[in-house]
């Protein structure tokens, strides 16, 4: 049996271990004037969002899945006073704090939090200016004097409950991502410390992408279709240059994959990642949002003579998938049943963003009734969860989960 702490060679193998993040006070630091800045469209009610998330976690446990939490793993990674101090300094450096006295006050605030879990959760929640002591006039620098009425000294990280994106598990390796927006790129700091210092994961997992890269990639665009084939999305959040870097590293490090299918589709927020429009639910079945099919282009990428070989695939997507996965026929299950109104509405509510926890066993939001009925007609067993508040962040069950271990298929 493999001793690697990360083992993810498919999208559908029985899920054994998964990482989540329970929404916290970062959601209470959302306000209407700054939603776009923080990549939100609405403000979830935290109490109900936590109840929904707890039900999601319990549904996974009921299926035999071990649930880990990002905040706990990050806290366990601060294994010495030196590493703790390094974490605080790196967090402050990336927080874009305006004003030297403000930065000094926040440093003291964080150092004063003795419990590691509480410290991590505070860094996630952000810091309001009203939490800090008033700076004496004589100590203020120019930045302090001309500072705006923006209420935060450090922005919250409200997207953290979408644990799929800051890093992605690929085989026995991890892609520690550089994200599309500054407000989310800070989230990858927790993954850095987990895979560098955690007692179980630290120093034991190869990185096939690093957060220090200057091009962007996010985990919602990284899908493990089989032990031989990956899929990546060229999307609003992931660019082609990042994909090339990722693939060269995967092939050079012999992570185990032979081919990558790169999906190029519309670049906009409603299709922000590949997994918002396309997920694998069984050996031969995928959900798909019909609106992407017309303009979709698929490229096959292999590694030959120490360089990437890229060929545009021709023909029907179902045929391309069947050929590359070695199955007789692939069924594309269209969100909303292909009805233009139902498809648009249910894709917006993440009807295509499913989490497969075993072949043909899928976690979905209960609200997407049209799509769910069709999935059941295809013989899938659905685990339906409520998501009235969680969905306000524009993510579904796959977005909210990062597999650490799946059984091989």
From Swiss-Prot:
Gene3D superfamilies given in the database record: Arginine deiminase, L-arginine/glycine Amidinotransferase, Chain A
E.C. number(s) listed in UniProt: 3.5.3.6
Cytoplasm listed as a keyword: yes
Biological processes, Gene Ontology terms: arginine catabolic process to ornithine; arginine deiminase pathway
Active site: 399 (amidino-cysteine intermediate)
CC terms in the record's Gene Ontology section: cytoplasm
InterPro entries on file: Arg_deiminase (IPR003876)
The protein's name: Arginine deiminase
MF-aspect GO terms: arginine deiminase activity
Lineage: Bacteria, Bacillati, Bacillota, Bacilli, Lactobacillales
């Amino acid at each position: 049996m493999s001793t690697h702490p990360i083992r993810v060679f498919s999208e559908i193998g029985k899920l054994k271990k998964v990482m989540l993040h329970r929404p916290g006070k970062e959601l209470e630091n959302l306000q209407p004037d700054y939603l776009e800045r923080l990549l939100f469209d609405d403000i979830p009610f935290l109490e109900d969002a936590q109840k929904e998330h707890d039900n999601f976690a319990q549904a996974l446990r009921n299926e035999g899945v071990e649930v880990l939490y990002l905040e706990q793993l990050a806290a366990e990674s601060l294994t010495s006073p030196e590493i703790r101090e390094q974490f605080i300094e790196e967090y402050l450096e990336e927080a874009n704090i305006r004003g030297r006295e403000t930065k000094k006050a926040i440093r003291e605030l964080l150092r004063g939090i003795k419990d590691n879990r509480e410290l991590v959760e505070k860094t996630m929640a952000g810091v309001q200016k009203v939490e800090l002591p008033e700076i004496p006039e004589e100590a203020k620098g120019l930045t302090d004097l001309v500072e705006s009425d923006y209420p935060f000294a450090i922005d919250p990280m409200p997207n953290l409950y979408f644990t799929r994106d800051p890093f992605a598990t690929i085989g026995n390796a991890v892609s520690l991502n550089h994200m599309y927006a500054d407000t989310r790129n800070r989230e990858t700091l927790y993954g850095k410390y987990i895979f560098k210092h955690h007692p179980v994961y630290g120093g034991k997992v190869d990185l096939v992408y690093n957060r220090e890269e200057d091009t962007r990639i996010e985990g919602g665009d990284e899908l493990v279709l089989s032990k031989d084939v990956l899929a990546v999305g060229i999307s609003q959040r992931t660019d082609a240059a990042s994909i090339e870097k990722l693939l060269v590293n995967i092939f050079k490090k012999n992570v185990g994959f032979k081919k990558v299918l790169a999906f190029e589709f519309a670049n906009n927020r409603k299709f922000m990642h590949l997994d918002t429009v396309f997920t694998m639910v069984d050996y031969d079945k995928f959900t798909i949002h019909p609106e992407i099919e017309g303009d979709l282009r698929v490229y096959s990428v292999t590694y030959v003579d120490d360089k990437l070989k890229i060929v545009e695939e021709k023909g029907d997507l179902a045929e391309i998938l069947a050929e590359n996965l070695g199955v007789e026929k692939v069924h594309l299950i269209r969100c909303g049943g292909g009805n233009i109104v139902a498809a648009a509405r249910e894709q917006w509510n993440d009807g295509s963003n499913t989490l497969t926890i075993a072949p043909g066993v899928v976690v979905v939001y209960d609200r997407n009734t049209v799509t769910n009925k069709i999935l059941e007609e295809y013989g899938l067993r659905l685990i339906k969860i409520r998501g009235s508040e969680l969905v306000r962040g524009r993510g579904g069950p796959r977005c909210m989960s990062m597999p650490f271990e799946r059984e091989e298929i």
